[in-house]
């Protein structure tokens, strides 16, 4: 039985959408990662670790992204109001304005990407994609990595 390569289709669509989004966000001097971090930090007080988990970013990428946001004056690392040991990512006023403009761009790019779908089909697609993302978030058993022979 021949079926569509779901992994390939998702990868191609994701890659194309990410490229479109990156190009569009250049207009406000943001990357998709920066936009994602700013939006999650604006939602509520969150630590760098919490935001990294929400954004599916590894530790090194998260640190680098927050460093960039700090250099641009868009966010700051601050002590948490609820846990003195933790540092939160606080968005500056400049960062809030950039994130709002960035979100308008994100919404426009998403609308353009899904524009060929009817409203009910679009809603069903986004719902199904969200469910799929939740299902595959836990990758399950990982392949065994064998040591290379020398």
Please tell me what each predicted stretch does:
Residues 1, 120-150:
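C-terminal regulatory/oligomerization modules of transcriptional regulators
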Residues 2, 6, 17, 33-34, ...:
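N-terminal positioning helix adjacent to the helix-turn-helix/winged-helix DNA-binding module
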Residues 11-14, 39-43, 103, 130:
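Short, locally clustered residues in the helix-turn-helix/winged-helix DNA-binding domain
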Residues 12, 47, 83-85:
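A conserved beta-turn-beta hairpin within the catalytic core of GNAT-like acetyltransferases
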Residues 18, 67-130, 134:
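Charged, amphipathic alpha-helical coiled-coil/dimerization segments
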């Amino acid at each position: 039985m021949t079926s569509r390569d779901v992994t390939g289709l998702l990868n191609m669509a994701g890659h194309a959408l990410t490229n479109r989004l990156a190009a569009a966000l250049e207009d406000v001097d943001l990357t998709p990662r920066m936009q994602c971090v700013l939006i999650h930090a604006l939602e509520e007080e969150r630590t760098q670790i919490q935001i990294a988990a929400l954004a599916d970013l590894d530790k090194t990428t998260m640190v680098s992204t927050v460093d960039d946001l700090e250099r641009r004056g868009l966010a700051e690392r601050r002590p948490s109001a609820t846990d003195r040991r933790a540092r939160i990512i606080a968005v500056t006023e400049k960062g809030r304005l950039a994130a709002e403009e960035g979100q308008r761009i994100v919404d426009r790019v998403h609308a353009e990407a899904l524009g060929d779908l009817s409203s009910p089909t679009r809603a069903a697609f986004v719902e199904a994609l969200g469910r799929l993302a939740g299902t595959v978030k836990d990758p399950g058993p990982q392949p065994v990595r064998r040591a290379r022979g020398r």
